[in-house]
A protein has these predicted regions:
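Catalytic cores of Mg2+-dependent Asp-rich isoprenoid enzymes
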Residues: 2-190, 196-287
Length: 287
């Protein structure tokens, strides 16, 4: 039984489920995705959830690295075989024996892959498959980052490439043109902030994304350098859904950097909502 990407009541249910899972997994991205127009919303939600599905494998506390690599490569190969959808059991063989261990968002990857409109869905499958392969490589090396080039390689693989995908989604939706080098910086900058925020927790599980000899100040500098590209990327966007989307994670990333520099562990929920309200107020005045 094959399921194409169709618009209908089933797709409405899938969209509702996707937004609910999104809300449970990431408030940071739930808000900007929830304000996107129909069509683009499904595409960006599909991309986010497919990538979150593989990210949950990469970060899974109960799986060893060899198992992570095996699961990630199985997902990649399944996505590469997509034609006009995926059989109901397409991903099951790859998950066999791990169904009760994996996160709900991971087990639901088939549904997320079918959420985007069919004219763009294969681009999301492509990006997710490539990212899963890269994650498998990093799992096998236990995420050993020795140099800044290693860090650039990692942040491109799991985030800079997301910036490239978003650029393709904006162009697909309404023809918006963007600078792809800045798009990579957008992804890398957000990822560098995550690395800073999660550094202590990562060390506890035996993973260190800091290049050898780097301090938090060095990673701050790396994050700010990439966020300068992210700022150029965001500022170049015309008024519209792409700008509305990008402003929110960009603003929260800068807010998180400032909070970390001032000794806080992260932004509080009230900080997040205050920053977003400020952004909305500015946009309302500008419109």
């Amino acid at each position: 039984m094959w399921c194409k990407n169709q618009v209908g009541s089933g797709n409405m249910d899938l969209r509702r489920d996707a937004l609910q899972i999104l809300k449970e997994t990431s408030r940071t991205f739930y808000i900007p995705i929830s304000i996107l127009p129909p069509g683009l919303q499904e595409a960006v939600a599909s991309a986010y959830l497919c990538m979150r599905a593989i990210d949950e494998i990469e970060d899974h506390p109960e799986l060893d690295n060899a198992t992570k690599a095996k699961l990630l490569r199985a997902i990649s190969l399944t996505l590469q075989a997509g034609v006009d959808g995926f059989a109901l059991d397409a991903f099951s063989a790859g998950f066999s024996g791990y169904e009760n261990t994996l996160a709900e968002v991971t087990v639901g990857i088939r549904e997320w892959s079918l959420l985007a409109p069919e004219t763009i869905a294969p681009r999301i499958w492509d990006a997710t498959a490539a990212m899963a392969d890269r994650m498998a490589y990093w799992a096998e090396t236990n995420w050993k980052i020795y140099t800044e080039s290693d860090l650039d390689r990692y942040t491109f693989g799991v985030a800079g490439a997301v910036g490239l995908l978003l650029s393709d989604l904006w162009t697909w939706y309404d023809g918006t043109q963007t600078n792809r080098t800045q798009a990579i910086g957008f992804g890398r900058g957000l990822q560098a902030v995550n690395i800073l925020r999660n550094h202590t927790e990562d060390l506890r599980r035996g993973v260190d994304f800091f290049p050898e000899g780097w301090s938090a100040a060095d990673m701050q500098e790396y994050a700010r350098r990439n966020l300068a590209l992210a700022e150029a990327y965001t500022n170049s966007l015309p008024t519209g859904p792409a700008l509305d989307f990008c402003q929110i994670p960009f603003t929260l990333a800068y807010g998180t950097l400032d909070a970390l520099a001032n000794g806080k562990e992260k932004l509080s929920r009230s900080d997040v909502f205050a920053l977003i309200k400020q952004l909305i107020d500015v946009n309302v005045k500008a419109s």
